[in-house]
From Swiss-Prot:
It catalyses: a lipid X + a UDP-2-N,3-O-bis[(3R)-3-hydroxyacyl]-alpha-D-glucosamine = a lipid A disaccharide + UDP + H(+). The gene is lpxB. Belongs to the LpxB family. Keywords: Glycosyltransferase, Lipid A biosynthesis, Lipid biosynthesis, Lipid metabolism, Transferase. Condensation of UDP-2,3-diacylglucosamine and 2,3-diacylglucosamine-1-phosphate to form lipid A disaccharide, a precursor of lipid A, a phosphorylated glycolipid that anchors the lipopolysaccharide to the outer membrane of the cell. Pfam families: LpxB. It comes from Aromatoleum aromaticum (strain DSM 19018 / LMG 30748 / EbN1). GO terms for cellular component: membrane. HAMAP family: LpxB. This is Lipid-A-disaccharide synthase. Gene3D superfamilies: Glycogen Phosphorylase B. NCBIfam families: lpxB.
Length: 391
């Protein structure tokens, strides 16, 4: 009888991660069958998508509330299917708000439930890890400091590295990136990344444009590239340029190409998030800037216990790059922070060494290590019940 694995990936990044995992498991278990909720990359690996992962996509709290009944119905229908089919294992890929509820009920049915990509429990106070302990048979972590948190709570855990570290070259090619983007080789380039969400671009675009204006006044040879993920975010940034009367600034907007823009750049101004990790893997000096609603920020400050929001600082356990948040994210402060990188080659070289060490630590063949951690859970007998020892 073929090994059967149920999976849920809730967004495009999870679809990619899960597709690599399916391929890695199949290298060890060629007859394995996969089904559940997934996207086109998973389907290209032979995944049977009962629902497309796009059905799980929500945009903010209001959208989540509006679609609660629909999403709850999908989750309960999948739970019934899994409990009836009794696959060898269930793997939830990211999407913790959807998956942890599902995993808890699947695990209590005697089916191993593995969660791939630890929620950011390290960023928040409180007892969320207690709920995770009740839900999962095994946690797969992307960052090296995470396993200790789960081990302390008695949760079986494996460190598998970060998939971006496997993909990104250890030595990025700035010249090739500039050639690809038709950027000059004899000037300094600043990449401006105001975020992928419309709310982020609305919040940061005007500030980033004024920052660019200040830098252009100081450096006649400077240029700016702004990769934007969608037509909507591009339109918002264009509106901000028009409102700022900034037609004279050497700012070039790109559709996508965020990695290429950062590779081509001398320094990066980036909203906190995965893009800051990408900038670190590309060994680029950066300034992290973020602005959210005042009540959200107060809540975040009350709940958070880490002194940083940016992944480069969190992973290095040190303030290696500036973070300017909320009211501190003024054009003057951002321009001054970027200027310090532009004027200090030694500091940039030292930072590149820190980021190189981080890159090597995260480069672990994520899909292969994740598959190796999952394999012991496959082909369990029907009588198997989860326990600290067997998990």
């Amino acid at each position: 009888m073929a090994t059967r694995i149920a999976m849920v990936a809730g967004e495009a990044s999870g679809d990619l991660l899960a597709s690599h995992l399916i391929r890695a498991i199949r290298q060890q278990v060629p007859e394995a069958e996969f089904y559940g909720i997934g996207g086109p990359k998973m389907q290209a690996e032979g995944f049977d998508a009962l629902w497309p992962c796009e059905r799980l996509a929500v945009h903010g709290y209001v959208d989540a509330l509006k679609r609660y009944r629909e999403l709850s119905g999908i989750r309960k229908a999948l739970l019934r299917r899994v409990q009836a089919d009794r696959p060898d294992a269930f793997i939830g890929v990211d999407a913790p708000d959807f998956n942890l509820w599902l995993e808890g009920r699947i695990r209590s049915s005697g089916i191993p439930a593995i969660h791939f990509v630890s929620p950011s429990i390290w960023a928040w106070r409180g007892g969320r890890i207690k709920g995770i302990a009740r839900s999962v048979s095994h946690m797969l972590c992307l960052f090296p400091f995470e396993p200790a948190l789960y081990e302390k709570a008695g949760i079986p855990v494996s460190y598998v590295g970060h998939p971006l570290a496997d993909v990104f070259p250890l030595v990025p090619d700035r010249a090739a990136a500039r050639e690809l983007l038709s950027l000059p080789t004899d000037c300094r380039i600043v990449a401006l990344l105001p975020g992928s969400r419309q709310s982020e671009v609305r919040s940061l675009a005007a500030t980033y444009i004024e920052t660019a204006r200040l830098l252009a006044e100081r450096h006649p040879d400077i240029g700016f590239v702004v990769p934007l993920a969608t037509r909507e975010t591009r339109a918002l940034f264009e509106q901000a340029l028009h409102a700022a009367d900034a037609d004279e600034l050497p700012i070039r907007l790109l559709f996508g190409h965020a990695v290429e823009a950062m590779t081509a750049a001398d320094v990066v101004l980036v909203a906190s998030g995965t893009a800051s990790l990408e900038a670190a893997l590309l060994k680029r000096p950066m300034v992290i800037s973020y602005r959210i609603g005042k009540w959200q920020y107060r809540l975040m400050k009350r709940m958070a216990y880490l002194p940083w929001v940016g992944l480069p600082n969190i992973l290095c356990n040190d303030s290696v790059v500036p973070e300017l948040l909320q009211d501190d994210a003024t054009p003057q402060a951002l321009a001054d922070a970027l200027d310090r990188w532009l004027n200090d080659a030694d500091a940039c070289a030292e930072l590149a060494l820190r980021f190189d060490a981080l890159h090597r630590e995260l480069r672990q063949d994520t899909a292969g290590r994740a598959a190796a951690a999952i394999l012991p859970y496959l082909n369990r007998s029907p009588e198997w019940k989860p326990s600290r020892q067997s998990a």
